[in-house]
C-alpha cells in the first residue's frame, strides 16, 4: 500500500518491511545518492 492505495507486488522495489519472529515490525525505504545518469 502506497499513499493509501494498493499497488502491484514488486512495483516499488526500494520499499522494505522488517519482520521479527514472522511478525511485521516496521517499514522503510532503501535510498542511495546518485550522480550523473544513475551511477552511484
From Swiss-Prot:
One example GO MF annotation: serine-type endopeptidase activity
Question: Which species is this UniProt entry from?
Answer: Euphausia superba (Antarctic krill)
What task does this protein carry out?
Serine protease with fibrinolytic activity.
- Secreted as UniProt keyword: yes
Could you tell me where this protein is found in the cell? Answer: Secreted, Extracellular space
Keyword Protease appears in the UniProt entry: yes
Pfam families given in the database record = Trypsin
Peptidase S1 domain sequence ranges: 1-40
What keywords are annotated for this sequence in UniProt?
Disulfide bond, Fibrinolytic toxin, Hemostasis impairing toxin, Hydrolase, Protease, Secreted, Serine protease, Toxin
* Designated name of the protein: Fibrinolytic protease
Which top EC class is given?
Answer: hydrolase
Amino acid at each position: 500500500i502506497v499513499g493509501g492505495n494498493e499497488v502491484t507486488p514488486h512495483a516499488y522495489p526500494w520499499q522494505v518491511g522488517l519482520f521479527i519472529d514472522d511478525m511485521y515490525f516496521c517499514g522503510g525505504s532503501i535510498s542511495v545518492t546518485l550522480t550523473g545518469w544513475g551511477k552511484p
